[in-house]
Amino acid sequence: MKVGIIGLGIMGYRIAKNLAKDDILNYVYDRTPAKAMEFKKEFENVEYFNDPTELAKSSDVVITILSDDNAVTSIIKPLIPIASNKIIIDMSTISPITSYELAKEINSKGYFYDAPIIGTSIAVENKSIVILVGGPYEKFETVKEILTHTSNNIVYMGGNGFGLKGKLVNNLLIGVYMAALSEAFNFGLDLGLTKEQIGYILSKLSSARSPTSEIKIPKIINGDYSTQFSVKNIRKDLDIIINISQHYNSLVPLASLTENLYKITESLGYSSLDFSSIFEMYRKLTLK
């Protein structure tokens, strides 16, 4: 079975490394050729393609991990004529509606799965990410067998789009939580507490502490916003959530408010940095 990966961004590169280390990855493609060439230097047995469709022709299983709906659609649409008996696993976070429409076309010939990730780039390296899978159960065990090389927790959610629905539920909470965490931290500083005092309360003592607070509080204290999950991506996900909520007539006022806070954070130059940098938005806009 030949496996190819399309998309070598923050998450995709690390997933590809996990598969390559276990000798199950054959091909890679990225729209930035230098990334694919860099990967080839590290893993000589992996071939890189200059064209995603050519990669797909040579692969039995194609994994995509891309930035947004447009990127996924532009890659998947040309694969429809050659999808016969192929398994396509899209690990991007996009609209479930977009994913479902693509799945209908692919599933007429092959097998399409949405398989978004819960977890950071560090969790990918540790193989501790959660992968939520939506798609035909018929080939799920094959999909799971491949993904176990990069995750120890793979959950079948149901039909096409249901993996993404689960991911969006998670990201609504994560997006709002990070904003609330930053607001509380900023409030504590304004009250005269030290960063260390606030960090200890929020990450160790609070009943609202979580893996997110334990990971992100040190980043805030140290001003280290190296990207694990970017501001632009959480803002993009909240935008998807808001649009989907209208389709399902669901009330998401906190998602709407929080999306605007991340937009402000982007406008201040933090778009590509870790989404914990929303704390800097609070500091810059705090009135003294």
Residue ranges of predicted features:
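Rossmann-fold dinucleotide-binding core
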Residues: 94-171
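Amphipathic alpha-helical hairpins
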Residues: 10, 61, 67, 71, ...
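Helical "substrate-binding/catalytic lid" subdomain
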Residues: 162-285
